[in-house]
Amino acid sequence: MQHIKEQYQQISTILSFALIPLSGFATDIYIPSLPSMASHLQVSSSAVQLTLVLFMVSAGISQLFVGSLLDSFGRYRLGIAALAAFTLSSAVIALSGSIYMIYAMRIVQGISVALIVVGKRAYFMDRFSGDTLKNYTSLFSIIWATAPIIAPFIGGYLQSSFGWASNFYFLGLLTLVIGLLELKYGGESLGQFQPFKFKPIIQVYQSMLKTTDFTLALVIISLCYAMLLVFGMTSPFIIEHVFHYSPVAAGYSSLLSGVALMIGGIISKSMIRKSLTKKITVAISLQLAFAISMIITAGYYSSLYTMIPFVLAIHLVAGFVFNNLFSYCLGRFSKNAGIASGITGGLMYVMASFFSYGLVDMVNIKSQAMLGVAYLVLVTLILIFFILFYRARYAATSLQWSRS
């Protein structure tokens, strides 16, 4: 088995960082191309939006279990196989004229990305420790957040210059190059292989999901992420078909949306010592005000320049709420931090996909007003689940005090 050579350690680390945002790139890069795909494949907008959902659901479910596979069979061989599968499936999508073939390949890509990303996160745990490990892991969220910023920007230009298939050629070429570099400079990072045990994993997951405050926090962050997905699924059709702007403009809009989400996360870190209940209550109140104002404004005038400011404000607050409660979920089970991370990331993808696609399917989002209605529905659900979360958290804290 090929192991990482000491002189290639730095290159392996750079390659690992390069693959962490792959899940975001695999969805966000072709968001500006959704209208073109629907037209070329002669299918409805919801049919091409389903390609996003299938990818995220397969990636989310896979994240729940691939950690144990990687611990049992190693990171390197599974990672190389996943990169090869992703590259080939990207080529098939680009060449395919069938939406059903694209569906199948997106599921393959979701599973592949789960193996790649989880394996690369584990690489850092295998190779580093102490302050070095802390420094590297602190960069994960920042690097992951680059995808919704950079990918739509690239995708908009690819769509305008070469068409929708070029996005998948780009993804395939990217993973092919990284895969070849992995073959030359990479290697197995796992020191000790573990036997694969399925039943104990399920038991731990069941125990976590029975913890009410954890599960409710997980639902809330899924609703926050669903806001970004709803915008990603619908904004290209509004911007390109209703406002008559180019795919490049749709790409820039998604870029700004990603920046707003990142700023919200940064603000949350600066307020880490503030009361969780107070700051989330204020944040949800602001989101309600922004969503209602977005709907009212659309009754008088609607354009790209009236829609995007409201979107950015809502997404900034969503990033704030998301970061606070995502941290809460990860810290809720300190003794099983790895499993908590897997279940939080995996189920968040699955639930956010169902929330967003279900809402897009029920609400015909073809205007600023209807996008505002979709946001209002999501914020109202966040408010309801946060009230339930507050009560569950208070009950759990009271129980701990009574036992002590």
What do these predicted regions represent?
Residues Q42, G74, L95-M101, S112, ...:
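Helix-breaking motifs and short loop linkers at transmembrane-helix boundaries and internal kinks
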Residues I61-I99:
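Conserved MFS/SLC helix-loop-helix module at the cytosolic interface between two early adjacent transmembrane helices
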Residues A85, S89-V92, Y100-V108, Y305-A313:
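Paired small-residue
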Residues L173-Q192, F386-F389:
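C-terminal membrane-cytosol helix-exit motif in multi-pass small-molecule transporters
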